Regions:
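Extended amphipathic ligand-handling, pore-lining, and cofactor/metal-binding catalytic surfaces
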Residues: 1-277
């Protein structure tokens, strides 16, 4: 955003580790911020991720007794730069491994964060977002064959999205498996431990060569697409968020897309790239 001539303060808050939203809210208020843009770094909108992040911010604002305009930006996985970014990671990983995605003995597997089925029954479209995002990324990587598995927290007594990633790996008839952590935009225990160690062990026990695609959290293209998402709501050169309500229809820089009202959030002023469907 700074490279685009916009004077914007950027803060990073986490849901489960420091700095938590309460700390960032206090800091932003002390800095004299007049309005906020809330952008969860979850490409695929879900109730326990994106929607929960908005709720955490709203709760922090309420505890701070700070009545500040907030523009919420929800699911953004259709952004073409994001699709290209994930596809390029797949192609590069396959190239480094010396395998071809066109080879029938090479399997492309998307590993998505699982969600309780009850959320889908209540109207969440998370599984649909996963399916369409994987289809778009696979097409951009010019790979016609792929499968999707979910990383589920089976220690909780709930019905989860299926198939789980372990079952997918157990069913693959191939020599190589290229695994894409499609729901994740940073490396953490669910990629570094669950995939790189636990799933790798299961794959190698079945004779599969395991190749994991890195999460492109530090790629400049990722920072650029986040700037694309925020720029329509920043008033240059003041750097303040503009009109936090009634913004549906605004075009997004460097794309053919425009914002629509978020159907998952269902709150005035929340926009996303999924609402038109």
């Amino acid at each position: 955003l700074a490279e685009r001539g916009l004077d914007v303060r950027v803060y990073c808050a986490f849901q489960f580790t420091d700095p938590l939203p309460d700390e960032i809210v206090e800091q932003a208020r002390d800095d004299g911020v007049a309005s906020l843009i809330a952008l969860p770094v979850y490409p695929l909108c879900g109730p326990s991720t994106t929607i929960a992040a908005f709720a955490a911010l709203r709760d922090a604002l309420e505890r701070a007794e700070w009545d500040v305009p907030v523009q919420e930006i929800s699911g953004w996985h259709p952004h073409p730069a994001y699709v290209r970014l994930r596809a390029s990671g797949i192609v590069e990983t396959a190239s480094r491994a010396g395998v071809s995605l066109a080879d029938p003995r090479v399997a492309l597997v998307f590993s998505a964060h699982g969600t309780p089925v009850k959320y889908l029954q209540e109207g969440s479209r998370y599984d649909r977002y996963v399916q369409e995002n994987c289809a778009a990324v696979a097409a951009a990587a010019e790979c016609e064959r792929y499968v999707i598995g979910y990383q589920n927290h089976t220690n909780r007594p709930l019905e989860w999205t299926q198939p789980d990633i372990e079952s997918v790996i157990a069913s693959i008839d191939a020599d190589h498996v290229v695994v894409v952590p499609i729901s994740f935009m940073h490396e953490q225990s669910e990629t570094l431990a669950e995939l790189d160690h636990e799933l790798r062990e299961e794959a190698e026990a079945r004779g599969l060569a395991f190749h994991r695609v890195p999460v492109p959290y530090d790629d400049p293209a990722f920072a650029s697409l986040l700037a694309d998402l925020c720029e329509p709501f920043v008033d240059a050169p003041s750097g303040t968020a503009t009109r936090p309500h009634g913004v549906a229809g605004r075009p997004i820089p460097n794309t053919q897309l425009a914002y629509r009202a978020c159907l998952c959030r269902g709150q005035p002023g929340t926009v996303c790239l999924n609402g038109q469907r």
